[in-house]
Amino acid sequence: SGGMMGIPSSSESIAPLVSAETARRIDNEEPFEWKIGGDVSVGKLVRQQFGDDVVDHVVSALLGGVYSCTADDLGLRATIPALAASLDKLAADGPVKLSDAVRAMEQARPRTPGKGAPFQTFRGGYAEVYEALAEKSGADIHLDSFISGVTRESEGFRVKGAPNEAGLYDRVLFATPAPTTARLLPALSPAASAVLKKVKLAGSVVVGFKFDSDTDPNGNRLPDNTGILVGTDQTDVHAKAFTLSSRKWPHLAERGGALVRASFGRFGDDALVRAEEDDLVDYALDDLQHITGFDGRAAGVSEIFTQRWFGGIPRYDETHLDTVAAAHAALADVPGIEATGAWSGGVGVPAVVADARG
């Protein structure tokens, strides 16, 4: 409990996960100079103030579940902007402590306990949303069209690869990954294209299971929590996280059995993303048993589903926000062209929707 994305205000909340020496270091943190408006990788900052244990055991595990990157690959302002703002505020009075910045955020949180499930979703999944949006938009949607570029003509934009009957378009919105957008833009904005080529992507793969029961024949049950995060220094475990879906989403438990999702892959290491499905299934079942004691094979596996995302999420490093600003500044000089996506507004549906509306 407490803290911010695994970064603690004291050793109390993470003491079982770090060494006694690290705990003392957290509680006796040395002040440091923070440049107002500056940026740094989350990993570098936390290692500097609290040591490697906190990054490798806690922070990278939490951030990796969201961004498919370690803390060392992620910029503070792009991923934890509120913490950067807290450091900025404290730095107005001189040297700062990371623990003080986190504590200030903890104290600013609403104290009213929430009611109901901490996670919410659509009973039929996000497919319900996509289908409703497609229907309400009234748009002509062309699936499986290979778009190779966009060019300007006297009366509008031509999208290369769109069906011939589509003709010219008054405006074009690119809602594609940054490298894809970069490849489509050279004829319209060489500057934006060059900037977006700098954005690197992380891949991931999930393996979903439906077990016949949440208890194996030896009485080992799946944990009652909603998920499991794995530290980056756990070399004997392949998975980076498990989502206990039937626990996290109560309506899924109504289907019977137990639904569990194993997640693999981090930035810079696509070996697991490209691994054979049979190997991924074995890794997931072995890791789950190693961590929880639950033997999924013995409990019975009735369904398996694998989904891969090659380059599914940007690396939000300490230069990312400047890259985004430069890309949008270049596109502002091209009337009729807009770009959005996770590279622009941040990870997650709310962030992407907010950026698109902006």
Describe the role of every protein-language-model region:
Residues S1, D53-H57, L201, N218-L222, ...:
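A short alpha-helix-loop-beta-strand transition element characteristic
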Residues S1-W34:
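Dinucleotide-binding Rossmann-like beta1-alpha1 core, especially the glycine-rich loop
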Residues G2-M4, P8, E12, N225, ...:
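Conserved flavin/dinucleotide-binding core of flavoenzymes
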Residues T22-G149, L168:
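Active-site/ligand-binding neighborhood in enzyme catalytic cores
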Residues R47, Y130-E135, A182, P186-S189, ...:
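Generic solvent-exposed, charged/amphipathic alpha-helical segments
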Residues D52-V59, S193-K197, F294-E303:
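Short, surface-exposed acidic
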Residues I141-L143, F174, A339:
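A structural signal for the hydrophobic beta-strands that form the central parallel beta-sheet
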Residues S145-R261, G265-V273, D278, H290-I291, ...:
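Mid-domain catalytic core of redox enzymes
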